[in-house]
Amino acid sequence: MSGTLYGLGIGPGDPELITVKALRLLERAPVIAYPAPEKGESLARSIVAPYLSGGAKKTEVVIRMPLVEARFPAAAVYDRAAEELGGHLEAGRDVAVLCEGDPFFYGSFMYLFGRMAARFTVEVVPGVSSLTACAAVLGAPLAARNDVLTVVPAPLDEAALKARLAGAEAVAIIKVGRHFAKVHRVLDELGLVGRARYVEHATMASQRILTLDAVSADGVPYFSMILVHQRGEAWT
């Protein structure tokens, strides 16, 4: 009998934000897998590290991701990972894939899901997303009353960003990173800099909350977000 593939949402960074269900499945799974940069440590692995010390030894599969936007190098990585994890599942071993935030909110797990769901039993365990975490640490509700919340990936080109932001009521700009200067420029053109809130590494020890004008464009990490409320504090 084949094992089950679990996509575990492990939250935005604070280990205490892992759900009870995700923790139970993590502790039970003999195999865990997680994304990591080509060089360096895995954020996902570091989030769950407090729960792995002292327990039964697990097989760990590190999925090294290239830092490029092109689709095909990443596709090859997911192909190889699906094959390796499939071997464990076919041998009857459950596999828990660790996903920062929520697996199905821009999560890398969806690419394994697309490759493996037709062959194996898959269970997706939702997690605390970066959206809700950033709103909480900023003390700024995502949306109020009948406001429409728009999620905008910062890698969009400048014209697309401007079009998405121009008429939006409440906006979360995600994956800011090296696109900060472009995003700042668009917000300035739309007169929204004063209504924007910036946070990086929300809920982590390295968390920082800054005004947009205080942010150095050269040092913005991938895990950063800008929340914008066109109507100001619509919840007051």
Task: List each language-model region with its residue ranges.
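Short acidic active-site motifs
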Residues: 21, 84, 157-161
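A contiguous loop/helix-start segment that scaffolds small-molecule binding in enzyme catalytic cores
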Residues: 5, 165-236
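Glycine-rich, flexible N-terminal cofactor/catalytic loop recognition
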Residues: 1-63, 163-167, 215-216
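Glycine/small-residue-rich loop that forms an oxyanion/phosphate-binding "nest" at active or ligand-binding sites
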Residues: 61-93, 97
